Design a protein with these regions (language model features):
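Unchanged
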Residues: 1-250, 362
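Left-handed beta-helix
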Residues: 1-7, 196, 205-375
Length: 375
């Protein structure tokens, strides 16, 4: 198999976290990034050629995290990843040029009989070998992966699948859904398709002048084809806004969720950093929390996730918070129900307090010298 990995999803509701990075490189559970999950699913299925698309101006954190791609087996002689900018394809379309030429060239050169299409907005750990097996048995051109969830977990433009008595599938956007059921089949924007069929489909869409997004076209047009489906039953989070992102991290403090997502038979790979272990002073007090390596903890930490290289100094209190890489909570500061982005500093005695429904977000690199209390 080869893969097309789309990372162009965006949401104003995730700002300011996405002011400096794409959704794909949002931090998760102390040491991971969201893109680690689709890349790990691909790696575990021995997919060694990956075509990635990102938005213009959002690739710095991507290259910093991916490096050579070695952690996901993408640094070999015949194993590699390619990064393209979505807006370049949009401009080619505006100029009347062949805007899917790079995609078609990639698919033809891969010589892979099957192609995986996926994104990085959904946090899940899918066994693509199992999906491929079902795809082959079904004998259809397309297999899509879904999870049954409460409609409240779907964003307005997420795709909901419906099945009639004969198993034929139809689909619509969440905001078009009539009479929502207790559980709906949420499309995880993950497909396995026959590569020859995909090449013909892309060529047809290009000739018709359709939008320059294969993932969008496939979701919009799959009702016109005989599509097979695969139900994913593992852990899943849908990242749509600050609240959903905060909750997705916080539920990792529950052992069942942590084990299901990160320590199943499908390992999750991430960028390796050889750092010293975290230091806990004799006065520190840590309860029900997770911490990355290289931290210094002298204060109190409760129900929180502290990323690599962060500091919680003497007298500081951190509760129900996400502290990103290399941030510092100084002496006697209080941080509750908050997300402290990378390299931020909370000065001595400052209080950062939000609520579980609306956590306070401190932007990357901020130095906070005054209280921020939003109750």
């Amino acid at each position: 198999m080869c893969a097309l990995l789309s990372n162009v999803s965006s949401s104003q509701a995730l700002r300011p976290l996405t002011d400096v990075r794409p959704i794909a490189t949002l931090p998760f559970d102390c040491k991971y990034r969201l893109i680690d999950f689709p890349l790990s699913s691909l790696s575990n299925a021995h997919v060694d050629n990956v075509f990635m698309t990102f938005n213009e101006g959002e690739t710095q954190s991507v290259f910093d995290h991916l490096g050579s791609g070695s952690e996901w087996g993408l640094d070999g002689f015949n194993s590699r990843y390619f990064v393209y900018i979505q807006q370049d394809f949009d401009r080619l379309k505006e100029q009347g040029k062949a805007y899917f030429a790079q995609h078609l060239n990639f698919l033809k050169k891969s010589k892979a009989p099957y192609t995986v299409l996926l994104g990085s907005k959904f946090i899940c750990n899918v066994d693509l070998n199992a999906v491929l097996k079902i795809h082959k048995l079904a004998g259809k051109e397309i297999t899509t992966v879904y999870k049954k969830v409460s409609p409240t977990l779907a964003a307005e433009y997420d795709t909901i699948l419906r099945f009639d008595e004969e198993g034929k599938m139809s689909n619509c956007y969440m905001n078009q859904l009539e009479n929502p059921q207790e559980k709906e089949a949420l499309c995880l924007n993950l497909f396995i398709v026959n590569t020859d069929w995909l090449i013909d489909f892309i060529q047809e869409m290009q000739n018709a002048g359709e939008i320059a997004s294969i993932a969008h076209l496939l979701r919009a047009r799959m009702k016109d084809y005989d599509v097979n489906s695969y139900e994913y039953t593992g852990y899943m989070s849908n990242i749509t806004d600050i609240k959903s992102f905060y909750d997705a991290n916080m539920v990792m403090l529950e052992p069942q969720n942590f084990t299901s997502l990160l320590y199943s038979s499908q390992p999750v790979h991430t960028k390796i950093k050889n750092e010293v272990p975290t230091y806990f002073s004799k006065d520190s007090n840590v309860v029900n929390s997770q911490l990355g390596s290289g931290c210094i903890i002298e204060g109190e930490v409760k129900d929180s996730l502290i990323s690599r290289g962060s500091k919680v100094l003497k007298g500081a209190q951190v509760e129900s918070a996400l502290i990103f890489t290399s941030s510092k909570v100084k002496n006697d500061a209080v941080v509750k129900y908050a997300i402290i982005d990378k390299n931020a500093v909370i000065e001595n005695g400052v209080q950062i307090i939000g609520t579980a429904e609306k956590p306070v977000v401190i932007p990357k690199g901020s130095v906070v010298t005054e209280d921020v209390i939003e109750l």
